[in-house]
Amino acid sequence: RITAAGPACARSRALAGTTVPAPAEPDLAAAPGWAQARRQLAAFLTGRLAAAAGARTVHPVHAERGPGPGRDPSQAMGPVAAAIEYAGAGAIRYALARVPPGAPARVDPCHEAARRLDVPAYAVRYAHAHAASTLRQAADLGLNRGEAAEFGPRPLAHPSEQVLLDELSWLPERVAGAARQARPDVFPRYLERLAGAYFGCQERCPAVWPGMGTGGPEISARLWLAAAAATALRAGLDLLGVDAPDRL
């Protein structure tokens, strides 16, 4: 169902009947400092997640105003703009999105630019890219997932596969829960658990591997699982406004 739903796999009606403020998307590079950038992004993401969970959103009359439509080139570059220029908009946006209320909002651009799995933004995006690569490799090998109507989770019996299935099943509720609490920072952390579950599953139960022979029901099921993981991770990153590259 996740693969068939595409980006809508993260949506639900959990907050139907509620109304939530939805400020305009902030220009993070124009923010004078980290604290303001985090506040503006958190307010925006709360509204965005709430809308995905079925809430009615309204533009607040007294929304916090940013410094304008963009940074004045004649002014010195602020810390957020400098970090975005160094590490990329997606990495900095993700790092800010996961900062909880009350915690220091400062982000280390050198850390966020690193291509390591202990960097949360990179780990989640790499998990998506790995799943997309798995599907490309399967296609190159002539392996077919089969029809969606024929898929059943029965072959996915390994504990690591069950963990990934469980994490995937919570996606819409994690979106709604983050919006309900006005804590968008908890949603990136869910995506990190999902990425970790995917890596654990691929380490123990890979869908493709060098020298593999023909497929079968088990391989088809694993390919569907990889496709579901790729779809869910992309949907989650899209909600955060972070790109989900197919190759890293």
Regions found by a protein language model. Name each.
Residues 1-248:
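Non-catalytic interaction-recognition regions
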